Amino acid sequence: MVANFNPSVGSFVWVEDPDEAWIDGEVVQVNGDEIKVLCTSGKHVVTKISNAYPKDVEAPASGVDDMTRLAYLHEPGVLQNLHSRYDINEIYTYTGSILIAVNPFRRLPHLYSSHMMAQYKGASLGELSPHPFAVADAAYRQMINDGVSQSILVSGESGAGKTESTKLLMRYLAYMGGRAAAEGRSVEQKVLESNPVLEAFGNAKTVRNNNSSRFGKFVEIQFDEKGRISGAAIRTYLLERSRVCQVSDPERNYHCFYMLCAAPQEDVKKFKLEEPKKYHYLNQSKCLELDSINDAEEYHATRRAMDVVGISTEEQDAIFSVVAAILHIGNIEFAKGEEIDSSIPKDDKSLFHLKTAAELLSCDEKALEDSLCKRIMVTRDETITKTLDPEAATLSRDALAKVMYSRLFDWLVDKINSSIGQDHDSKYLIGVLDIYGFESFKTNSFEQFCINLTNEKLQQHFNQHVFKMEQEEYKKEEINWSYIEFVDNQDILDLIEKKPGGIIALLDEACMFPRSTHETFAQKLYQTFKTHKRFTKPKLARSDFTICHYAGDVTYQTELFLDKNKDYVIAEHQALLNSSSCSFVASLFPPMSDDSKQSKFSSIGTRFKQQLVSLLEILNTTEPHYIRCIKPNNLLKPGIFENENILQQLRCGGVMEAIRISCAGYPTRKHFDEFLARFGILAPEVLVKNSDDPAACKKLLDKVGLEGYQIGKTKVFLRAGQMADLDTRRTEVLGRSASIIQRKVRSYLAKKSFIVLRNSAKQIQSVCRGYLARSVYEGMRREAAALKIQRDLRRFLARKAYTELYSAAVSVQAGMRGMVARKELCFRRQTKAAIIIQTWCRGYLARLHYRKLKKAAITTQCAWRSKVARGELRKLKMAARETGALQAAKNKLEKQVEELTWRLQLEKRIRTDLEEAKKQESAKAQSSLEELQLKCKETEALLIKEREAAKKIAETAPIIKEIPVVDQELMDKITNENEKLKSMVSSLEMKIGETEKKLQETTKISQDRLNQALEAESKLVKLKTAMQRLEEKILDMEAEKKIMHQQTISTPVRTNLGHPPTAPVKNLENGHQTNLEKEFNEAEFTTPVDGKAGKSAAERQIMNVDALIDCVKDNIGFSNGKPVAAFTIYKCLLHWKCFESEKTNVFDRLIQMIGSAIENEDDNSHLAYWLTSTSALLFLLQKSLKTNGSGATQSKKPPASTSLFGRMAMSFRSSPASGNLAAAAEAAALAVVRPVEAKYPALLFKQQLAAYVEKMFGMVRDNLKRELSTLLSLCIQAPRSSKGGMLRSGRSFGKDSPAVHWQSIIDGLNSLLVTLKENHVPLVLIQKIYSQTFSYINVQLFNSLLLRKECCTFSNGEFVKSGLAELELWCCQAKEYSGPSWEELKHIRQAVGFLVIHQKYRISYDEIANDLCPVLSVQQLYRICTLYWDDSYNTRSVSQEVISSMRTLMTEESNDADSDSFLLDDDSSIPFSIDDISSSMEEKDFVGIKPAEELLENPAFVFLH
């Protein structure tokens, strides 16, 4: 596939390996046309250059999703790409428009979820990762857009996953074209549910697959002109009939036989069945059970599927009767009869099975035996009965079993088709072909011959399609392709089906001659095709022949060719079963018409060829799409990739043939930018001089001397081998460049070493010179220091001698002066102490007297109070014992609390009286103390005078003898009284202490009672609150019940939020019809009027409503940031008492007006205005409306306390200032919002307003999402520079700058924010809009990142990161309005952060999961890590240890179906409630709002002033 490959030493190549098919290595030696390769396994291989293929060393480690993008399109390159993708669970790969699916042998539910189908809906082929959904979507879109029917051909060998792929395709087509099931099951459901029935009767275990389809199936999904599924049909081809009678070990027969043997016991008895090993048709193989299949459960599942497709229970029993009869017929053995060449049932066992089979088929036992053992030959003259020998009878038995099973299978297909329902008038169809793949076994019989013929025909169709695609590619790129030749397999088809002279024609000819055998047939083939290049005779074979198919040589054994080719029903069998008393069995063998009896010879081969021609005619009228299924290993286990096996399947599936066709033209196709980025180093001057990419590519190729290439409009087309030649030259340039770089680096390192050495020498010299200079300087410093020390020491000694002398003199003087001062101080202290002692003694005596009096009074008072308190305590205890439960007697408890409060107040008054008495006594004691002090002062004055007089007298008078005191008795009396008073005071002090203790105890008891009373009061408040809440709930439930009752009994048309009604106003009044005279409250018209006056009043009211609607239906602006329309509507409804009216049509007209106003869903400004108006009106209704007396504004407050203590506590808690402010605010709010009694129409109006708020919120949010959706697809992938690298000077992006798309997103966010702010949308709604929008951005960017491999690159991560930085800046600037929106981008932020981090291979899994990307799941991390490739620095992704850890974790979580999903879901729910809107506004915000000026001029709206 690669011509002119000239490897050099150092080139990397692929060489053949007996174990791995192909192995890579490095060329270490070139000898002429031979090279020596060092393989990655470590061994050396010598091979010819023609047997080696170049390896692309720059291919991504995770492979490419489209193999046409491979640098080298050859076998080892394709195999390596599939292997790389299979290792990371990327089981789907494109080859152009062909999808290759490698069976993972494990469940991957995340790849097939409904969310994944939504991702592929409308995406062009190749835009997202390869997937069957992409193929199905491309077929569906092409059918709708081009008006051409489509077909999807699914092929592969047994076990490759064809059936599962077909199911996925049908699921997606049902998703795209399915209609809502109004009655019963839809067409697509019936098609999908018919699979279990067909699998039960058409699938079996083979060597390579446990559930292999042994028939071909073509499902036609029919569509109408609108693209909806209108019908379907299933066509089957070549059921393997011989499997019914012949089963090779270790295969199994069809599943239905084993299911029936494992059926419930009553069914087993009814059909007289035993274990499978007892039946000849089943025990030819030792494999009777499968580990992965429970036959009993499958039996019930098949029964249920039959019910779904419309097969009745009677028909099901008849079907399984035929299946059981086949098993019994297989157990009939024959022995030689009495006559020559005759046969009879061998033994009683055979007779039993014969009888049972006759009973199950409802036919005569003897007639069944005769049909098996005899033949009737009709001649002109007579009828001859011929007996059959045992061998012939056995063949007759097997022929009957095969024809019965074949007819049964055909009946099932017809029944399914009739149940599904075909649309013969359908406009288009999409056909899904599930056909067997190319087969080559050790023994190949007639079935393999037909299967391989089918694959040859389909391969020719496939080759023509690939050729056509190549032509379209060349035409699209406008290159010359007329001289290109492609390989065709028409010669093989002529060999097989040419008439006359083909193999099938010769086989039919042999079947028409009774004496022909397989040996004569083989000899005929040898003679006819001995010179044919595709036909050979194997050595030592007498009846085998070999055909050289496109996928390889297959040797066929002709032993059973003639028997298997005969397509006729033995007349005896036909007559027997047609006469069956069972209508079902008789319908399988209808009587043959005279034309069919006299028709020409018919064979399986001819009939199959006709079916094949019919199929190809259908395919030729459709646009084909191809899916090639690959089985990675024969063990049917996950994680095993067998190169040789897969390579053979690629050849059999035609993939390699398609590659050969591509290689016949231009196998290598590179976009200009990729080509220049890779090979620009071959001619850098060309890139600098040329700004035109095609011209630069042409000059580069001309410079390197390549010929035969083509320059298209967007790509460079290279012939086979030219890419390898360019890579060889590139390797040489890189080698020379590496040598130059090494030389420069070594020169740089030598210079650097010299400079370092020179600098080191300079530093050493500098250090030495510095050391010498510092030594000299140190000596000079020491000499100067010695002189300073000597000078300072002498000065110190002189100063010390002087200081000692001076201190001695001062000490002597200080001692003398201190002694004199101390004597004077001692005298003064003694005098002052005497005065203080006298003062304290006198004061103590006075205080002692006062305390005695005070203690005596307090003791008396406390004794009395404690007596009274103990009495009260006894009463309270008695009352407490007699008091019942708190809830049952709350009125008594309140009374007791009031009494207790009164007692506490009484104690407080007593305590106050005591304090007043204390104050009076203290005042008296103070006054007496003052009198005593005054007397003391007078006495002191007299004493002083007496002392002075005595001194004077003593100085003047002579010495007199002392005279004794005469009044000694008086002194003794005073002393005794003093002692009595002291004893009395001490006793009073003791009593006072006891009284204080009792007082403390009494106070503690009183405090405990007070606490108990407070707790009781709080419990009462809580109970009342709970009771009030229950009452409110009961009232709300009664109101809802009333609303529901009125809704059920109401008969007129209800209003629709999306499309309001247009019926006349008079007949539409919230579900009721009434006279206009009764619409409004009678209080509105207080003056008695007659009928005419009442009618005029009603008309005036209608005119007022019209005036209101005409005014508010347009944008009338805002007042103080609040919508004037909402306030005006609310005031009018409040004044007209509409909220309290049982029947009114005002609300219906307002709803109709709002619905009409928001019909334009694209005008965000208009929607924002009405969003603000309706939310404000909803807030006013929420605050105003109440049901059955429970006001909305009071529902959240606890009930007011009715007890005396409760009222006292509330008065203590609230201050006068706060009460005045609250009263003022409440009064202002009540001036705007007034609680009213709401009736049913008002409550319904409130619900409709809430629905409109949610609808308008969703419309504004969805408008922003739609605006951003187109920009997000441009923001996920960085634009590629046309010539990449650093070979060309940078140029400005202009209008295509990467920042333009992100700036457009910012502009869109700003534009909407300005609109919302201008219309005063509540802040909570703005934050929710942006929060959900950022969540949508996160979902779209993250899912696109995980679905597109080209987005998981380093440069793309930097591009998206810069855009996210712009969004973060916007969030910071609009923080008040964006709220937590930035946090919604956590998934894409962490994913992009991982893409741009360096040295990923050094990061452990714990660091990734815990530090870098804690939000991402292991499936998401695994997806990013495996898809990542560094397009800037060519660095590696994470290590294999990290990948292995992720795989282990995913395997552990594989039991959870949702755990495998790596995509995010967009949340379109309404993220707020009415309470959120209410919490964002306050009643006082509406104070001072001016009503609509237009209405103020209307006399009917005077109340608005």
From Swiss-Prot:
Where is ATP bound in this sequence? 156-163, 209-217
Region described as Actin-binding: 495-529, 531-554, 589-612, 612-634
Entry keywords, A to Z: Actin-binding, ATP-binding, Calmodulin-binding, Coiled coil, Cytoplasm, Motor protein, Myosin, Nucleotide-binding, Repeat
Domain named Myosin motor is located at 62-731
Myosin N-terminal SH3-like domain residues:
8-57
Classification via SUPFAM superfamilies: P-loop containing nucleoside triphosphate hydrolases (SSF52540)
Q: Where is the Dilute domain?
A: 1148-1452
Instruction: Specify the IQ domain's residue ranges.
Output: 734-763, 757-786, 782-811, 805-834, 830-859, 853-882
Q: How does it assemble?
A: Homodimer. Interacts with RABC2A and RABD1.
Protein name per UniProt: Myosin-6
Say which species the protein is native to.
Arabidopsis thaliana
Taxonomic path: Eukaryota, Viridiplantae, Streptophyta, Embryophyta, Tracheophyta
Q: Gene of origin?
A: XI-2
